């Protein structure tokens, strides 16, 4: 993609758990990204992207900053965003379902909640 379109590539890593194997997998993938000059960043997400599930952010706590961007996703909400940013110190946060309106029996009322978005932004800026 990078060679043809000349756009930055962001690699995604799905974090499944907190075992030694998970930590080793994260370390190996991070090393691969750091060695790849075409990769602009790495996105850490939960084991099932889009499911709104968090993972143990402490697994990323000691990642050293480099010129690669660190993206954090997976179950972020206004309530946990400040702790996530404090623990991981990402360059970018990714939120979707965490700022949606509460479940409504009518699909016509689904969508993003402006108050939740405002609170989320306030909390990640702390």
Residue spans of the language-model regions?
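Alpha-helix N-cap and loop-to-helix initiation/capping positions
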Residues: 21, 25, 55, 59, ...
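Conserved, mostly hydrophobic/aromatic
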Residues: 42, 56, 60, 84, ...
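Glycine-rich phosphate-binding active-site loops on the catalytic face of alpha/beta enzymes
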Residues: 47-49, 87-117
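Short, well-ordered alpha-helices that flank and scaffold nucleotide-derived cofactor binding pockets
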Residues: 65, 86, 122
């Amino acid at each position: 993609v990078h060679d043809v379109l000349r756009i930055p590539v962001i690699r995604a890593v799905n974090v499944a758990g907190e075992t030694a194997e998970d930590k080793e997998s994260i370390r190996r993938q991070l090393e691969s990204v750091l060695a790849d000059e075409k990769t602009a960043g790495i996105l850490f997400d939960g084991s099932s992207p889009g499911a709104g599930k968090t993972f143990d952010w402490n697994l990323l706590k000691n990642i050293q900053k480099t010129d690669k961007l660190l993206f954090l996703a997976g179950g972020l909400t206004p309530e946990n965003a400040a702790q996530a940013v404090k623990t991981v110190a990402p360059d970018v946060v990714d939120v979707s379902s965490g700022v949606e309106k509460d479940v409504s029996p009518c699909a016509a009322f689904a969508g993003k909640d402006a108050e939740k978005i405002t609170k989320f932004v306030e909390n990640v800026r702390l």
